[in-house]
Amino acid sequence: MGSTDSKLNFRKAVIQLTTKTQPVEATDDAFWDQFWADTATSVQDVFALVPAAEIRAVREESPSNLATLCYKAVEKLVQGAESGCHSEKEKQIVLNCSRLLTRVLPYIFEDPDWRGFFWSTVPGAGRGGQGEEDDEHARPLAESLLLAIADLLFCPDFTVQSHRRSTVDSAEDVHSLDSCEYIWEAGVGFAHSPQPNYIHDMNRMELLKLLLTCFSEAMYLPPAPESGSTNPWVQFFCSTENRHALPLFTSLLNTVCAYDPVGYGIPYNHLLFSDYREPLVEEAAQVLIVTLDHDSASSASPTVDGTTTGTAMDDADPPGPENLFVNYLSRIHREEDFQFILKGIARLLSNPLLQTYLPNSTKKIQFHQELLVLFWKLCDFNKKFLFFVLKSSDVLDILVPILFFLNDARADQSRVGLMHIGVFILLLLSGERNFGVRLNKPYSIRVPMDIPVFTGTHADLLIVVFHKIITSGHQRLQPLFDCLLTIVVNVSPYLKSLSMVTANKLLHLLEAFSTTWFLFSAAQNHHLVFFLLEVFNNIIQYQFDGNSNLVYAIIRKRSIFHQLANLPTDPPTIHKALQRRRRTPEPLSRTGSQEGTSMEGSRPAAPAEPGTLKTSLVATPGIDKLTEKSQVSEDGTLRSLEPEPQQSLEDGSPAKGEPSQAWREQRRPSTSSASGQWSPTPEWVLSWKSKLPLQTIMRLLQVLVPQVEKICIDKGLTDESEILRFLQHGTLVGLLPVPHPILIRKYQANSGTAMWFRTYMWGVIYLRNVDPPVWYDTDVKLFEIQRV
């Protein structure tokens, strides 16, 4: 009954606030206390009892009352942080104010006129803590709020375990408390694992949700093309002003990486006990990736003096960016810390793949997209971590889940962002030689995927999944094709033995991409052929010995290479090819690719359910902007190549078939000549046809085809195994052109990808926060909300 009464009183207070036309004095505590002192309303109650329309009405019609509500709520949080929340009543007030601000903040952010409100000063809230009355020293409301949240996240008996055993009199003084002793979870820089406490976890979660809502002002600003714009909320929270920056960074990172959703491995455990840890871990992951939203391409920012107390951070390194969270992340350097982080992320990413004989017996986590963003940030900001990941075959524990997600999401338009981040991570990894070498490890674990069964290595798995994405994904994935093939090019010089299934897939892609209608239907399509020829050349020149399957497939499909060498360039043939294009709506033919049986236990990739919400994404930069070319020297070191001057599309192809203009998200796979913008000419075809790198393959065919034909005639053979045996023991030493230098296209940070990551990350956070629906139905500007 008490709960119903308090809800009723709370609702009455809301109605009073919305109907009062006169400003209510800030000193009228009897009125304001109705919102937090007497109630025990859950966050769901607050969202139900404070409708969006009423918040907007107060904002428009009695703005001073909304301003006072926010000011008073922040004041209560500051008081709670100052006092240390010793009584249950104080704790309840802090939680109620936190929920109310979480509800109201998005409506402050959506109105440009209100955007500066939290950054205006409140008289008497002095920076020096002396309560100076002069406004010059007054702290903006946003700063007071953020510092109070930080203090409250390390408040003994509220969000952390108290270390004192004695009476209330000697309760820990919140000002002298060293929060590094109260880190939430063992892991990086902290060995002690505190006892799990359900109440503390729930309180942390509420405060983190408010913190995330503070940071979400970014959602209400349109994506700016060269956006170096820093989020003022994140900038202040991650600065030296926040004395809890290090322990909070460590707490968030350790909470995520130490989480084990399977618990003690008891089947159906999650059905018996509600897992209160997962919501906290999700919230921690989301707050962490937002605090790390920092454009590494422009990180030549002023530096801090590196004043950290944690030994886990590398003090030998020069101080990093002003954002302390990025700074701390970039300075983690101990092997055991890297191992803890990598094992934790791999365990969580692999969780949705867990197949057991008992259906639904293990808990499946839902925050894999946040984990992928976190993994990306770790690799991008901490090169030592990237090298650690690639040092052993542990990198494959990250690769397999990513390939699973890519394959699973390929038909679902609402998961285009997931496809992009998975491919971006693999592009980043593929720029390192060790990644290609690691792919030669046999693939034995059988994750049920909707792909043909094969026996081979992790390289086979990668190529088979990429083939599936290209041939049976939806059309919005076409901008990713050159990224996918760049990854294959980067690893190709190191692939020791591809399976027959994989060899056939690569030849099928070449066959599909080299049809005249595909080559002539868009200005960039021929680049895909260049990439595939580069793959074949790398394997023939550097890994011929173990790759008899691929050599045999090339011999069998030799007509494709002859057709490319004799590609017609006359106007009638070009016109005829384009006519055929208009009659062929399929982006790629799947004929000629033997699908074979799919893996046991797999389910086909399904399109999104109609009506599924998705958020729009900004276009990604083209592969030429995403990567820079490096040449591998004889000693294995990389030498960066000067970018060659780009020619315009009219006067020919870019150097070596390199994509010269971004393949934009908006670009449809249909012919662009229909809109009158571009149509292929004989000169254009000749300009790149003359650069097709066919010499190595033609020489191989010239040497091997007569020998293979002779074996077949002499022995009356139709058996592949005999031919493969011959190819395995054959050699082309001295018969092929001099090996070309290995070219690697390494990912390079740029403002375009930084903006893409920002929109993707906030889109994920928007869609994942449905209970309560923090941002739903507010006027966000960073992306559009669409229905599939």
Curated annotation (Swiss-Prot):
Biased segments, Polar residues type: 590-600, 669-680
Keyword set, alphabetical order: Cytoplasm, Disease variant, Epilepsy, Golgi apparatus, Intellectual disability, Lipoprotein, Membrane, Myristate, Phosphoprotein
Primary localization class, coarse: cytoplasm
Membrane topology annotation: Lipid-anchor
Lipid moiety-binding residues (N-myristoyl glycine): G2
InterPro entries per UniProt: Hid-1/Ecm30
Tissues/organs with expression: Expressed in heart, skeletal muscle, colon, spleen, kidney, liver, small intestine and lung. Highest expression is seen in brain and placenta. Loss of expression is seen in some breast, cervical, hepatocellular, lung, thyroid, gastric and renal cell-cancer lines. Highly expressed in secretory cell lines. Expressed in almost all regions of the brain, in cerebellum, anterior frontal cortex, and striatum.
Localization per record: Cytoplasm; Golgi apparatus membrane
Tree of life domain: Eukaryota
Disordered: annotated span: 297-316, 571-681
A GO BP annotation: insulin processing
Keyword Hydrolase: no
Annotated phenotype, changing G187D: In DEE105; uncertain significance
Entry keyword Phosphoprotein: yes
Record PTM Phosphoserine, positions in chain: S653, S670
Gene Ontology cellular component annotations, sorted alphabetically: cytoplasm; cytoplasmic microtubule; cytoplasmic side of Golgi membrane; cytosol; extracellular exosome; Golgi apparatus; Golgi medial cisterna; Golgi trans cisterna
S-S pairs: none
Function: May play an important role in the development of cancers in a broad range of tissues.
Family note: Belongs to the hid-1 family.
Illness association: Developmental and epileptic encephalopathy 105 with hypopituitarism: A form of epileptic encephalopathy, a heterogeneous group of early-onset epilepsies characterized by refractory seizures, neurodevelopmental impairment, and poor prognosis. Development is normal prior to seizure onset, after which cognitive and motor delays become apparent. DEE105 is an autosomal recessive form characterized by onset of seizures in the first weeks or months of life.
Protein name: Protein HID1
